[in-house]
Every structure is written in C-alpha cells, then in structure tokens.
C-alpha cells in the first residue's frame, strides 16, 4: 500500500549533491552582473541622461519624461546583450509574493517586419489588468484599472530572458495596492522627520536612510518526499505527523557542518544572488533539523525589501534544481522550531553617521540616546500595530507558541544601555545645566564603549532587541514581505521624531539650552515608554501577566490583532505622515481578513481530505488485519487461550475504532462549522469565526491522526513521516 512512500524515501536517501556551474571570475567580479547599476548606466546612457537619472535616484528629483526614452533605450541595449527578449513591471501586490507579466520587446517596424522596441513610456508606466489582485474592495471589477509605475530607486535587473523593472502598483484613483508604495512614503516621512532631528546635532545632514538587514530562515525538504505530502504541497506546512523520536533536543544541528547536498544548493543560490546584486554573506544551519539561514549585508530599506522578495523566488527556483523544495512557511513542522526573518533595522545619515550606534563623545552619545529613546517611544506607542504588521495566519503558529518571539511586543536593551537610561531618568536639570554651562558640550552622559555594547548579552526571547548598533525585529515571519514591518516601524518613527522635534522646540528658551531641552524631553520619554522595556524571559507566564498590567497589547487572536491598523492612534499616525489614508487602511485590512480566512479554509479542506482518504482507510485496513488475526486465533486455540493471546490486538482494534470515529465525526463537524462561517458576510467576523471555531478543530483532528501514526503498521502508512522528511539529505 505504501510502496510510493518507501520509493521516495529510498530515492531521497540516494540522491547525491547536484553539479552546478561555478563562475570563473571572483564574486567581486560577477557581483551585480545582471543589474543595471551605476556602472552600467554610465556605460549605456549619454552623459547628460546619466546625470539626470542619478539626480532622480539620489535626490528624488522628478523623472523628466524627456530622458525616459533614452534611459529605456540604454536599458534595452544592455538587457539584450545579456539575452533578454522580454521586459516586465515587477511589483509586490498584497499577496506574499511578487507579480510580473512579460511582454516581448518586439513591435511592427512598419515595413511588414518586426523590430526590438522599448520606449520610455513602457518603462515608466503600465496598466496591468489589476482586477484579480487583492484590493479590499478599492476597485470593483468594472473599474479594474490600476497602474504600475517605475521606482527608479531600485535598479532594474535581468532574470533569465526578462528585464525586470521594480514598480509601485496603485489604483487609478491613487490608492496603493501594494507594499512598495506605502514603504516609499514611510521612508520619505521618516527621512524628513529624522533630518530635522539630526540638525540639532549636525546641520550638514541632508538625508537619513533606513537600513534593513534581513536574516532569512528556511527549511529544505527532498522534493520526492514533498510531493508525497499533499499538505506540504497545498498549505506549505504539515497538517499532521507525529514528532520523530529525535528532533532538536540534542541541539546538534545549530551551526553544524552543512550537508553536502545542501551546501551545493547554498553555493549555487549565493552565486545567482550575487549576480543579481544581492550581497549575501552569511549561511548556517539553524536550530531545527533541515533548517537553515541566509543573511546579506544590510542595505537601504527599499532595496533590501526588493532583494528579499527576489531571493525568496530565487530560493524556490534553485532548490528545485537541486531536488529540494524550500519551505518558507513559519511553522512547517509541529514540535520543532519555526522560521522567522529577523529584520535588523537602523538609521544612518548621508554623511556616514550610524544613528543607532554609540559614539565617542558626549555629544555623539546624546544623539545616540535621542534616537534610541525615540525608537522605544515609537515602539511603545504602536506596540499593537507593530504586532499586527507581522501577524498572519502562518506566523500565528510562531508567536506566543512558546518559541521565537512571544505575542507581546517589548524591547530588550541589555544591561549597559538600560543603566544609561535609568541614570538619565533620575538626573536633574541642575546636573545637566551645570555641566552644559561649564564644559560646553560635556554633558553628563556616561561613556558607552562601542565594543561593550556590541557584545551585549543576547536575549533570544525578545521580539525587538537592541544589538549594539541596530534593533533586531525578530517577530517578522519567514514568509512575509519585510515591507509590512518596515512600513509600520518607519512610519511610527517618523511620527515620533516629528513629535520630539516639536517638544524640544517648545522646551527651548533663552534660559534653556538646546541640550538641556533635549535632555528634559528625553527624560520624560524614558519614563513614559518604560513599559516597553523588558529584559526578562519573554516566554514566561509571569511576563504575560506583567505585560497586561503594563498596558501592552496582549491579544493573541490573529484577526483581532489586525484591528490595530484601524485604531485611532494608527489612523492618526498613517494619515499625519501621509503614508496611508483611512480608506487604504480599511481596504488592506479587508485583504488581511480575507487572506486569513482562505488560509484556514484551505487547511481545513486539505486535512479533511487527507483524514478521509489516507488516514482512516489505512487505519481501517490495519484494523481489519488485526480482527482477522483475532478470529484465526480462535480457530486454532481453545477459547480461553485465544482470548489471552488476542487481548493486545483487541485493545488496538478498539483504539483504532475510537480514533477513526472521532476523526470522521470531527471532519464532518468541521465541514458544518465552515458552512456556518461562510454564511457570515462581514469579512472580519468571518475571519474571527474561522479562528475561533475551525482552527482549533484542525488541532483536535490532528491529535488523533498523530496517535494513529504511532500504532498503525509502518508498512501501510502512506505519508512520509517526520523522521523521513527531516533527516534526509
Ligand atoms: P546575528 O545572527 O548575530 O544576528 P547575522 O550576521 O546573522 O547576525 O545577521 C545580522 C544582520 O544584521 C545582517 O544582515 C547584517 O548585515 C545586519 N546588520 C548589521 N549591522 C546593521 C545595521 N547597522 N543596520 C541594519 N542591519 C545591520
Ligand atoms: Mg540576528
């Protein structure tokens, strides 16, 4: 019965590492080979066009339609030399992936033949039929027009035979239908607010960048085994499967030697990533078996987001070439760690100052403390929203599930930085005033040696940890678009820095120096945002109670957490910064609720199918064999002897009967519960119904299936088991 399972397991065991081509050049030589970067722009564009385009990229100058044709023509020439025949606007709709529609360069030449053509108009703007992308009701199908517009701040690149142009995607009436539009607006708002604050310390600052360095965790599974698991195939996670006797308890996988087959995949992936200009740097085994991590050197946030989207699709492609499937789902396997995507985030200026790194002088440290405290304030004020920004049906399996970050946002600072803030909190104006007066810039700010901070104790349970020169937002899901978290965080920072500037300006007077005013405001903030600081164990029960006392958002229901986007403080934050309108927020929430419902719905269907046509039949078949055995024993032996010999089997027969009955009944109940939920019109209420009634049933049914897996004859079991999925290379 399960010959397929044994065949795929055997094949997976025997699969050798694949060959792949290693470039003859060094990485520094092939880095960015397929990217139209500055070097290429310089080579393929006329001098004046190059200068104008650089102005557009660096200073956000408007794109002069006069140069668009020449830019497009240069791009086309470069792309065609690499073998490209098509181009596409590449955008990030409100699904977890990217979207593209390829058009060939060909046009009629007017003489009955064809020619390669790519105009500025096609580069700059297009109108893909947008009606089938999630839009939360912003457009009805009869008003399907939306358009994509080039984002010159992210360079175009070639994948296979296609020139890919990063674009934003908006409705005809201007509402954003993607992740990039609000991200660019958030970055612009943050830049403006942060530059203003920087001017307290350095009037020459012109621009503040938001930096993002993501760490991408993922699982690899042999593709034959993957294909034999319909749940993995259709939902990205295993909906059933008993824990293997050995999983991660020995902690022997973390940083262990990378298996040869996996190493080949990683090398191939890295080469292709570098060719696409993604500066990948770090790779290692993660905690769980078959779990790995990949991290690049951090980049400007918008580019880093694009690169993460690109690498996720590259990973899928390269994995298949190596006979693997990559699992980006946050929780593919029960009982072992899930995958996250730590978002390392910091701010830095155009003149090279890292705003979240301690400095050497008191003045530098005042600036450092200013940005740290404002970050804490932003996170404190919007902790519920930040949680909503990383929440999804899939990431819900990680959050609060006694691993990875808890479902409460708090920030870990480490002993040293905590002490500095505590010290500032209790200091008085007099301390400060005297010192400022006497020594000019010599403020009473403790020296903070950079090295020490860099080695601060790590707290793996903290969802938002300070790590020396950046904050690490760990709660982001492995499958998510980083933009969601980055939009919320940078917008919160924009609002907070704007408020800070206003507060400091108000506090300054003839008697109160700028430094004193800054310290006064910071001291107040340190007191206000104290509830967000937590250095203890984020997984503990005590913390849940304590966090509730502190007034932090402790909600655990995914669809209810989404409400945070529509709270008064969130709407004020997004609208005052010009990042999103109320209509956009409402539409996006509709998409979130709908997506949530659909994901649970699909899981429920798949589990129902598998239960009824894999598990119950196999269990029943095994049960029949046992029954047969019981009868045969009766024929061979006298009644009392046969009874004694059959006792074990009879209890197994009973257990199988009970569990299969339970499974059948609950699959029926789940269908009924879906019918009830599906009749609810309100998308939010429907999502809540799916969360409250259907999601728990998945777990209950699974429980009995996993118990059956332990007693049914291994020969008969059709689905590859955890021990096979997780330990084969
Ligand atoms: P760890 O696992 O110790 O957190 P990794 O090396 O796996 O460290 O990843 C750290 C990530 O943080 C990398 O992507 C790195 O580029 C990024 N990073 C380092 N410094 C900064 C910074 N100042 N701002 C943003 N990201 C940073
Ligand atoms: Mg990290």
Task: Set out the residue ranges of the language-model regions.
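Active-site proximal loops enriched in glycine and acidic residues that flank catalytic Cys/His/Asp
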Residues: 67, 91, 119, 296-298, ...
